[in-house]
Design a protein with these regions (language model features):
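Short loop-to-helix capping motifs
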Residues: 63, 111, 127-129
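Short coil/turn segments at alpha/beta junctions that flank glycine-rich nucleotide-binding fingerprints
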Residues: 35-39, 128, 157-158
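Short, basic, alpha-helical segments at the C-terminal edge of helix-turn-helix-like DNA-binding modules
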Residues: 73-79
Length: 213
């Protein structure tokens, strides 16, 4: 008796196997989500912009919301990649380490990837809690955790006196999220490099004054 043919395997969801096609699709989706937001963005227009079929989008991401989550995840990865591990810095030179960490974080908060990701996530706050939670876990929480780990090592080396490393890390990073960052989110004129350097030096001075051993 002839056996019936085996059913075709179901397509696996995730990024398309072709890296170039994946890049085009995520970049096109990012542009459309930036311009129109999640609710008004159109999958047909995204697919046409990326040069793929609408079927490809749904086969790989399941829905427009799934594609949006992939875009946010891609941006989060790029953002975190811009901040090298703080743990690798010398705990015996906290001022130098904080200047390096602060400079990278300041550049990150002014960058298009981070600002675009924040705008996109703010636009779905409440409606897409899983997307927001994952963005926070992969982005802000991870950066804060790495800085806290460095502060623990500096505390152990007795070059800083930090009783609550997570709180101290939060306070340090928050000093870079003032009016300059808000202007960036609102697409207004950004602070120039001289203002940013002055902010960096003052943030490190204030932190060392509070936590220096």
């Amino acid at each position: 008796m002839t056996r019936p043919p085996a059913p075709a395997p179901k397509p696996q969801r995730g990024r398309p196997r072709d890296p170039e096609r994946s890049r085009r699709l995520l970049e096109a989706a990012q542009r459309h989500f930036n311009e129109h937001g999640l609710e008004r963005a159109n999958v047909d227009a995204i697919a046409a912009d990326a040069g793929v079929s609408k079927t490809t989008v749904y086969n790989n991401f399941g829905s427009k919301e799934g594609l949006f989550q992939a875009v946010v995840g891609d941006r989060s990865a790029k953002v975190v990649a811009g901040v090298t591990s703080a743990v690798a810095l010398d705990p015996n030179q906290p001022e130098k380490a904080l200047l390096a960490i602060g400079a990278r974080f300041l550049a990150l908060t002014r960058g298009d990837d981070a600002l675009g990701a924040l705008r996109s996530v703010y636009g779905v706050a409440g409606a897409q809690p899983d997307v927001c939670r994952e963005f926070y876990r992969q982005g802000p929480e991870r950066v804060k955790g790495e800085l806290a780990a460095y502060l623990r090592s500096a505390h152990s080396a007795r070059t800083l006196k930090v009783r609550n490393p997570l709180q101290a890390a939060d306070l340090f990073l928050s000093m870079f999220l003032g009016s300059g960052h808000i202007r960036g989110l609102l697409k207004l004129e950004m602070a120039d490099s001289r203002e940013d350097r002055a902010l960096l030096r003052e943030a490190v001075r204030v932190f060392m004054e509070a936590y220096g051993a």
